Amino acid sequence: MSKTEIKTKQTNASVEDFINTFANTEQKRKDSFELLKIMQDFTGFEPKMWGPSIIGFGQYHYKSEKSLQEGDWPLIGFSPRKAAISLYVYSGCSGQEDLLKELGKFKMGKSCVYVNKLSDINQETLKKIMKSTIDFLQTIIARKKTEQIKMIKFVCYGKKEEYNQ
């Protein structure tokens, strides 16, 4: 199986222009600008376009052993799709299923939450879900960096005891 390249990458496109042209109702535009503020304030990251239709905040590098896909992806994000707003905030980590029970009215995708309008969900619960996802991803990132450092020591020194430290 060959390595496949991810198609959704960070771009320099204008987030505001995207929302103004892509959000198909006034309510969706209003909710999108509100989500933009919530996620930017919460994460401290500037919003960036990912591919033609995802607004992302922060990023992490991933490598899938299953699909052999590797690339960068936003820590959290959203997209004002035609049918609903897709929230890319769910990682399935411990405790998130309980938080979903408190979220409000939504539909669940494989790894995202679909909401018709922002007023349908509890924004404080949304922030808790965002926090748990970011914490989960940053823990994985830190663990992988530690493993890489240990592997570098093993390769450089050629001693098993160095690798196990």
Annotate each predicted stretch with a short phrase.
Residues 1-158:
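Charge-dense, helix-prone N-terminal extensions
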Residues 163-164:
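Intrinsic-disorder-associated, low-complexity terminal segments enriched in Asp/Asn/His/Tyr and depleted
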